[in-house]
Every structure is written in C-alpha cells, then in structure tokens.
Amino acid sequence: AVEAXKTYVRDKPI
C-alpha cells in the first residue's frame, strides 16, 4: 500500500 507518498510493506512504514 502507498500513503502520503511513502512506500509501505504489509501496512508498515519502511
């Protein structure tokens, strides 16, 4: 998923 232009994996920020 992608939120606020940031890349997420399994709904956890990386």
Curated annotation (Swiss-Prot):
It catalyses: GTP + H2O = GDP + phosphate + H(+). Disulfide bonds: none annotated. Its EC number is 3.6.5.3. Signal peptide: none annotated. It is an enzyme of class 3 (hydrolase). It comes from the Eukaryota. It is found in: Mitochondrion. GO terms for cellular component: mitochondrion. One of its GO terms (molecular function) is magnesium ion binding. Keywords: Elongation factor, GTP-binding, Hydrolase, Magnesium, Metal-binding, Mitochondrion, Nucleotide-binding, Protein biosynthesis. GO terms for biological process: translational elongation. GTP hydrolase that promotes the GTP-dependent binding of aminoacyl-tRNA to the A-site of ribosomes during protein biosynthesis. Belongs to the GTP-binding elongation factor family. EF-Tu/EF-1A subfamily. This is Elongation factor Tu, mitochondrial. The lineage of its organism: Eukaryota, Metazoa, Chordata, Craniata, Vertebrata.
